[in-house]
Swiss-Prot record:
Annotated CDD domains: SWIB_BAF60B
Alphabetically ordered keywords of this record: Chromatin regulator, Isopeptide bond, Methylation, Nucleus, Phosphoprotein, Transcription, Transcription regulation, Ubl conjugation
Cystine pairs: none
Residue numbers of Asymmetric dimethylarginine PTMs: R81, R104
Low complexity: bias regions: 34-45, 210-225
Name of the protein in its database record: SWI/SNF-related matrix-associated actin-dependent regulator of chromatin subfamily D member 2
Keyword Transcription regulation: yes
Role summary: Involved in transcriptional activation and repression of select genes by chromatin remodeling (alteration of DNA-nucleosome topology). Component of SWI/SNF chromatin remodeling complexes that carry out key enzymatic activities, changing chromatin structure by altering DNA-histone contacts within a nucleosome in an ATP-dependent manner. Critical regulator of myeloid differentiation, controlling granulocytopoiesis and the expression of genes involved in neutrophil granule formation.
Gene Ontology CC annotation, any one: RSC-type complex
Protein's organism: Mus musculus (Mouse)
Domain SWIB/MDM2: 306-383
InterPro entries referenced in this protein's UniProt entry, alphabetically: SMARCD2_SWIB_dom, SWIB_domain, SWIB_MDM2_dom_sf, SWIB_MDM2_domain
Recorded name of the encoding gene: Smarcd2
Location of this chain's protein in the cell: Nucleus
């Protein structure tokens, strides 16, 4: 029996054993006689009726599994023939050469390529596996020479010793960096001496006859210049300051109050105050000018600007802890050490503190939680006492002691803190180390490549024949992987491989794909859909 497909392609006659080709073209296979099984082309390796192909994965069944595993088109009655030329067959149009090829219902995505004689995997190239990329990165990051190279070049042991020393050095530097980071979080200060200079000048009043004119006349002296006045200056500097940047005098204080004699200047004009504000401009000193021709007793109250803030303890708690003025964290630490030393923590409920007689007087309770201590401690903390300096403003022109010096202790930032911050922020050495690491990685990779080439040439010089055969086998395996070829080339080069039952099924599918392709081309040319 012969016929023509869509587009006039001649169809080969169906042989009695060509049930697979007939099924591919839509015709039912020859009926099986009594005691006969369906054609091997339609029988699979299992009960599902799938087709077994040597060297490839088996197809899924193309239709309902049954005694004959016959393909049945949806919508067709059992036993009817598939329409041939001129009739709508198969799925909608699509290129048979790509992933969108028209497939028969039930056909898996894997199909026969029209120009190849073996089953193909999907055409899309799989991306490089993540494991291979990760292995490459690890190989690039590895600076250790392989054992085979160390055995070949004994001098490489010196490099391995340097590598071990570098590893220890990196661990030490990393540990020191962590210690520096922890140290920077804490306030690093050191005590320095701040010398305060308090001086005053006196301007006596001028006699009326000293000037040619009087106030209000041309050439006269203003009335304000006739009044005697004095000027007080408060300045200071750090002693033995190694830093190049000098700190302003006002930066050491939170507030400064100058209290003059109330009897001389009255209750409303005897105080001169300066308080730090967020917008305060730092200055090198303070000066106060007032009228007067008498010696004036004054009191300077200097409130230091502690960073972090410090507090003065209640006298009872200060005697108990041995701390007078300190930061809140230091006070809490001293309190905890006292509790631990005197075993005041409850043995069963560890969050409770059993107060002794001193704590009962201070906290006014016999038992309290440890979490309640900060709240109770807030009422026992006060602002630290200011620095009090008593000074006499002298207006006697014969008095040579018009400048007084006072040394006070202040806390300044440790210069080492700035160096540690610069060390952590510096990336110059890190960039240099990274560039050297890249060079080492490239050198190690080059050494490995040279070792591979040496092994290649050494094997070839030792056993040329065996080496060439093994090399060809390796290249053949690589070629199959690169070209995505599935199968056994040794079997495929023999004619008996193509006389197996699967070949007839493959021919039928190839012809069916060609018929579909030609039909779609005719529809596009005629602009109609054949029915």
């Amino acid at each position: 029996m012969s016929g023509r497909g869509a587009g006039g392609f001649p169809l080969p006659p169906l042989s009695p054993g060509g049930g697979a080709v007939a099924a591919a073209l839509g015709a039912p296979p020859p009926p099986a006689g009594p005691g006969m099984l369906p054609s091997p082309a339609l029988r699979g390796p299992g009960p599902s009726g799938g087709m077994g192909v040597p060297g490839a994965a088996a197809f899924r069944p193309m239709g309902p599994a049954g005694p004959a595993a016959q393909y049945q088109r949806p919508g067709m009655s059992p036993g009817s023939r598939m329409p041939m030329a001129g009739l709508q067959v198969g799925p909608p149009a699509g290129s048979p050469f790509g992933t969108a090829a028209p497939l028969r219902p039930g056909m898996p995505p894997t199909m026969m390529d029209p120009f190849r004689k073996r089953l193909l995997v999907p055409q899309a190239q799989p991306p490089m596996p993540a494991q291979r990329r990760g292995l490459k990165r690890r190989k690039m990051a590895d600076k250790v020479l392989p054992q085979r190279i160390r055995e070949l070049v004994p001098e490489s042991q010196a490099y391995m010793d340097l590598l071990a020393f570098e590893r220890k050095l990196d661990q030490t530097i990393a540990r020191k960096r962590m210690e520096i980071q922890e140290a920077i979080k804490k306030p690093l200060t050191q005590k320095r001496k701040l010398r305060i200079y308090i001086s005053n000048t006196f301007s006596p009043s001028k006699a009326d006859g000293d000037n040619a004119g009087t106030a209000g006349t041309p050439g006269g002296t203003p009335a304000a210049d006739k009044v005697a006045s004095w000027e007080l200056r408060v300045e200071g500097k750090l002693l033995d300051d190694p830093s190049k940047q000098k700190r302003k005098f006002s930066s050491f204080f939170k507030s400064l109050v100058i209290e003059l004699d109330k009897e001389l200047y009255g209750p409303d004009n005897h105080l001169v105050e300066w308080h730090r504000m967020p917008t305060t401009q730092e200055t090198d000193g303070f000066q106060v000018k007032r009228p007067g021709d008498l010696n004036v007793k004054c009191t300077l109250l200097l409130m230091l600007d502690h960073q972090p803030p410090q507090y003065k303890l209640d006298p009872r708690l200060a005697r108990l802890l041995g701390v007078h003025t300190q930061t809140r964290a230091a006070i809490m630490q001293a309190l905890w050490l006292y509790i631990k030393h005197n075993q005041l923590q409850d043995g069963h409920e560890r969050e409770y503190i059993n107060c002794n007689r001193y704590f009962r007087q201070i906290f006014s309770c016999g038992r309290l939680r440890f979490s309640e201590i900060p709240m109770k401690l807030a009422g026992l903390l006060q602002h630290p006492d200011p620095i009090v300096i008593n000074h006499v403003i002298s207006v006697d022109p014969n008095d040579q002691k018009k400048t007084a010096c006072y040394d006070i202790d202040v806390e300044v930032d440790d210069p080492l803190k700035a160096q540690m911050s610069n060390f952590l922020a510096s990336t110059t050495n890190q960039q240099e180390i990274a560039s050297l690491d890249v060079k080492i990685h490239e050198t190690i990779e080059s050494i490995n490549q040279l070792k591979t080439q040496r092994d290649f040439m050494l094997s070839f010089s030792t056993e040329p024949q065996d080496f060439i055969q093994e090399w060809l086998r390796s290249q053949r395996r690589d070629l199959k992987i690169i070209t995505d070829v599935i199968g056994n080339p040794e079997e495929e080069r023999r004619a008996a491989f193509y006389h197996q039952p699967w070949a007839q099924e493959a021919v039928g599918r190839h012809i069916f794909a060609k018929v579909q392709q030609r039909r779609q081309e005719l529809e596009q040319v005629l602009g109609i859909r054949l029915t």
